[in-house]
């Protein structure tokens, strides 16, 4: 049945619903390969490689050619603008390469977070001015979904009501609506940074508050929820919290409770960001989330960047002779997160120190 909105035809709604459901196919998740040029500078410098366009292309090619098993675990890939238009060594566009593997191409459409006037250290996301034209072109060039990241911080004064309203409106009234009108499934990402001294309970409460503002805005602007996905943080304590560290089960329960209180059942799926957790913690916590009993009407899976790529990048080290070994590492991380997305991960006895290393970056930006 079509929605009450007159902004989309039934055919448009059907296409959006189909794409969203395909992305959250059971046992599959998203590879977030949408790091900006600046973020890639940090990644490549960590292995002693210069941050050139060619090195960025070679690294993304390594990821996207990991082998026939990649599409068993990965349903979609989010790309940065540069990556979206790059090609393999033999001239095949990355978008075509992914489509041939049955993997859905996606695109990061925000242009980063900038300071928000009238707030204490909070930010808003830029990129709305030409978004309609860019979405139309990306759809024409093969994209089927998009991502827009907004950021909240937890402190004694934040998030402010000003930021809550601005970010919700940013995500709902313009970004999501524009994407849907151009045939792109909008992934809504209201990230709450893990920075801070807050306990798990405060992290849960702030997550619930953020979600309530976001979905109020989405509904107010007639966004077709069945054709959207949510990319939230998991509920954790702050990185500087000095109390007892919450268990995986604690994190799972707090996260699911926040979702139950704030995310409509019409939303097909929740694709979690890893938020600077170690690769292994991101997998264990995703598994714990899926093992929580009770009502969970959405698919609960992953949209990981660093938590899928960190060990892979280290193994590659910029050397051609390491490509195959690095791809094996990527496939392994994808496989264990596939298991976690259906609550069947039992731990990784082979996990090395790299997989357990925290990937937290203070005030992280993409």
Curated annotation (Swiss-Prot):
Entry's Gene Ontology BP terms: fructose 1,6-bisphosphate metabolic process; glycolytic process
Tissue expression remark: Ubiquitous.
GO cellular component, as recorded: cytoplasm; cytosol; endoplasmic reticulum; heterochromatin; sarcomere; striated muscle dense body
Coiled-coil ranges from the UniProt annotation: none
Necessary for preference for fructose 1,6-bisphosphate over fructose 1-phosphate, annotated site positions: 366
Record InterPro entries: Aldolase_I_AS (IPR029768), Aldolase_TIM (IPR013785), FBA_I (IPR000741)
Name of the protein described by the UniProt record: Fructose-bisphosphate aldolase 1
Pathway stated in the Swiss-Prot or TrEMBL entry: Carbohydrate degradation; glycolysis; D-glyceraldehyde 3-phosphate and glycerone phosphate from D-glucose: step 4/4
Keyword Transmembrane annotated: no
UniProt keyword Lyase present: yes
Catalytic activity: beta-D-fructose 1,6-bisphosphate = D-glyceraldehyde 3-phosphate + dihydroxyacetone phosphate
GO MF term list: fructose-bisphosphate aldolase activity; identical protein binding
Summary of the function given for this chain in its UniProt record: May be involved in the metabolism of fructose-bisphosphate (beta-D-fructose 1,6-bisphosphate) and of fructose 1-phosphate.
Cross-referenced SUPFAM superfamilies: Aldolase
EC id: 4.1.2.13
Pfam families per record: Glycolytic
Similarity-based family: Belongs to the class I fructose-bisphosphate aldolase family.
Keywords: Glycolysis, Lyase, Schiff base
Record-annotated active site: 189, 231
Annotated positions binding substrate: 56, 147
Residues in the signal sequence: none
